[in-house]
Amino acid sequence: MILEHVLVLSAFLFSIGIYGLVTSRNLVRALMCLELILNAVNLNFVTFSDFFDSRQLKGNIFSIFVIAIAAAEAAIGPAIVSSIYRNRKSIRINQSNLLNK
């Protein structure tokens, strides 16, 4: 695969994730956009690792760490969202002011 094509794909995924994270008002959608950003970062890690030095696996190892962090976020995030919904009866970001109670 050509490096430029993968970088364009990764930049496109990252841009969609940032746009969704900034404009979404729903916490579940924001978590999904955060996962999209992490996947774009993983794609960059693996691509640069393969392109510059395919014998060393530093990019792949970083990618595994990011996947582990994303898995923890995917497990804890919905639990936090469901807890917020139970307490506030809404998962909209602009309606849930967590500091007022």
UniProtKB/Swiss-Prot annotation:
Classification via PANTHER family: NADH-UBIQUINONE OXIDOREDUCTASE CHAIN 4L, NADH-UBIQUINONE OXIDOREDUCTASE SUBUNIT ND4L
UniProt-recorded name of the protein: NAD(P)H-quinone oxidoreductase subunit 4L, chloroplastic
Keywords, comma-separated and alphabetical: Chloroplast, Membrane, NAD, NADP, Plastid, Plastoquinone, Quinone, Thylakoid, Translocase, Transmembrane, Transmembrane helix, Transport
HAMAP family, per database record: NDH1_NuoK (MF_01456)
Keyword Hydrolase part of the UniProt annotation: no
Annotated membrane topology: Multi-pass membrane protein
Reaction catalysis annotation: a plastoquinone + NADH + (n+1) H(+)(in) = a plastoquinol + NAD(+) + n H(+)(out); a plastoquinone + NADPH + (n+1) H(+)(in) = a plastoquinol + NADP(+) + n H(+)(out)
Family: Belongs to the complex I subunit 4L family.
Enzyme class: translocase
GO molecular function, one term: quinone binding
Biological processes per GO annotation: ATP synthesis coupled electron transport; photosynthesis, light reaction
Subunit structure: NDH is composed of at least 16 different subunits, 5 of which are encoded in the nucleus.
Encoding gene, per UniProt annotation: ndhE
Function description: NDH shuttles electrons from NAD(P)H:plastoquinone, via FMN and iron-sulfur (Fe-S) centers, to quinones in the photosynthetic chain and possibly in a chloroplast respiratory chain. The immediate electron acceptor for the enzyme in this species is believed to be plastoquinone. Couples the redox reaction to proton translocation, and thus conserves the redox energy in a proton gradient.
Ranges that cross the membrane: 2-22, 32-52, 61-81
Pfam families given in the database record: Oxidored_q2
Lineage of producing organism: Eukaryota, Viridiplantae, Streptophyta, Embryophyta, Tracheophyta
Organism name: Spinacia oleracea
GO CC annotation, single: chloroplast thylakoid membrane
EC number of this enzyme: 7.1.1.-
Subcellular location: Plastid, Chloroplast thylakoid membrane
